[in-house]
């Protein structure tokens, strides 16, 4: 069965709760969702990361849950190369989620 948002590409610049939750729903509905993070990773990666019952591979359950079904790329927007990559991502995505 084809998903409702199959063929839609979203560039996800969100962090914390409401933004990642919204883009999680888009990804769950079939949108190709590309999360853009700083080179050191988005801050919520570490929430619960030290709890073995609530973490996997250094990422907490909070981050894993809200970012399921998404692709991820780390970009340093302070460099010329990083900014060029970001502009390329914006061009191919056509849809942007940010909070």
Q: What residue ranges belong to the model's regions?
A:
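N-terminal helix-loop segment corresponding to the beta1-alpha1 unit
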Residues: 1-99
């Amino acid at each position: 069965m084809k998903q409702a948002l199959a063929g839609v590409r979203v560039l996800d610049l969100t962090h914390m709760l409401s933004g990642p939750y919204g883009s999680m729903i888009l990804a769950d509905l079939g949108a190709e969702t590309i999360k853009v993070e700083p080179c050191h990773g988005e801050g919520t990666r570490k929430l619960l990361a030290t709890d073995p019952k609530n973490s996997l591979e250094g990422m907490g359950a909070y981050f894993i849950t809200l970012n399921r079904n998404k692709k991820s790329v780390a970009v340093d927007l302070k460099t010329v190369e990083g900014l060029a990559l970001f502009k390329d991502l914006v061009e191919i995505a056509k849809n942007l989620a940010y909070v």
